[in-house]
């Protein structure tokens, strides 16, 4: 062994021991429960929901092609649409990142539609006889790009009565919407999972989006509060709460497919998943021990709202047309309102979050 190697060894040993000693004296890394919750919600709740949405839209694109090629029937096409719509509804409390920017959500679903723009613009586009594909559709009005237009074609254009010529006139748009939704969903997911995407930004701080974990948790809660408020509007508007009690069934989110309440339930389940988290790593985990009563109150509010929705097997349209349906809808609305107010007031205060204005203010 060379002599100089022996001479260096004591110095190396001293350096190593010094480093270990300094490490032992350094304070342990402080725990950050908000960072843990943010990362858990992003990875275990939000990302899987976005992934399911992408998968549903891929199937929607396949379904449109199959229906138009007459290798799948109308019932199958409608079932695939309802699956995609349910996957979209589950995203409502999770609109963080690319989908919440640039009005992209309008390209997925156009609601509210107070003037039947969906039906009018679909028919106007079809009547032009122009070639339609996903590329041209991406620059068209958002009214005809998304699920609302797809729903119109499958449920309101009388496809079951259409002859081959009429079906052929709608099919290019149906196929284009399916492809457009698939591409949009895949782009949004890429914005989540890419380098420095939202997933990374909600998992490690600071970054370009969040100065710290508290900002991330604050956005999660703000999105929750806005979504819950929107759910109240989606139920309250057709109930007539903004029109002096006069029901407005055609203002329901999915009146054509009679699936408005199913979408509402999917959104509520997603909101509850953010609250509870996976392995108890949701917003609930951030409440201190002295807020146990509030945690249990929010738990109970979610259970009551979901139970009220689950106990009903009638469509929103049917309930609005039946005087006996009013107390049932009033009960569901009151329970949604309870969940919303608990988040907006008590939970925000307990987590020291200033909510400010939400996206629905001024509606």
Question: What do these predicted ranges mean?
Answer:
Residues 2-14:
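Bacterial N-terminal signal peptides that target proteins for export
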Residues 22-24:
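C-terminal motif of bacterial Sec signal peptides marking the signal peptidase cleavage site
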Residues 26-29:
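Bacterial signal peptide processing site
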Residues 31-363:
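Mature extracytoplasmic or organellar-lumen-exposed domains after removal of signal/transit peptides
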């Amino acid at each position: 062994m060379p002599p100089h190697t022996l001479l260096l060894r004591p110095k190396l040993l001293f350096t190593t021991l010094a480093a270990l000693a300094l490490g032992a004296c350094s304070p342990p890394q402080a725990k950050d429960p908000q960072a843990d919750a943010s990362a858990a919600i992003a990875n275990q709740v939000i990302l899987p929901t976005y992934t399911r949405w992408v998968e549903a839209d891929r199937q929607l694109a396949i379904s449109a092609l199959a229906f138009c090629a007459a290798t799948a029937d109308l019932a199958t096409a409608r079932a695939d649409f309802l699956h995609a719509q349910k996957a979209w509804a589950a995203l409502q409390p999770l609109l963080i990142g690319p989908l919440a920017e640039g009005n992209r959500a309008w390209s997925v679903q156009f609601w509210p539609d107070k003037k039947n723009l969906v039906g009018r613009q679909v028919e106007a586009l079809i009547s032009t006889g122009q070639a339609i594909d996903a590329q041209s559709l991406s620059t068209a009005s958002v009214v005809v790009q998304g699920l609302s237009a797809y729903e119109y074609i499958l449920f309101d254009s009388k496809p079951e009565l259409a002859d081959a010529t009429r079906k052929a006139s709608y099919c290019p748009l149906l196929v284009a919407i399916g492809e457009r939704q698939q591409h949009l969903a895949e782009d949004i997911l890429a914005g989540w999972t890419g380098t420095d995407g939202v997933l990374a930004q909600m998992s490690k701080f600071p970054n370009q989006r969040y100065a710290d974990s508290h900002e991330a948790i604050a956005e999660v809660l703000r999105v929750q509060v806005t979504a819950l408020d929107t759910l109240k509007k989606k139920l309250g508007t057709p109930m007539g709460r903004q029109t002096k009690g006069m029901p407005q069934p055609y203002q329901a989110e999915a009146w054509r497919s009679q699936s408005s309440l199913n979408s509402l339930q999917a959104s509520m389940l997603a909101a509850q998943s953010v609250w509870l988290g996976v392995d108890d790593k949701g917003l609930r985990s951030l409440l201190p021990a002295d807020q146990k009563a509030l945690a249990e109150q929010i738990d109970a509010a979610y259970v009551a709202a979901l139970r009220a929705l689950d106990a009903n097997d009638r469509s929103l349209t049917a309930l609005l047309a039946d005087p006996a349906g009013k107390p049932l809808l009033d009960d569901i609305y009151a329970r949604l309102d309870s969940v919303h107010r608990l988040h907006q007031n008590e939970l925000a205060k307990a987590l020291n979050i200033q909510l400010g204005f939400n996206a629905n203010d001024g509606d």
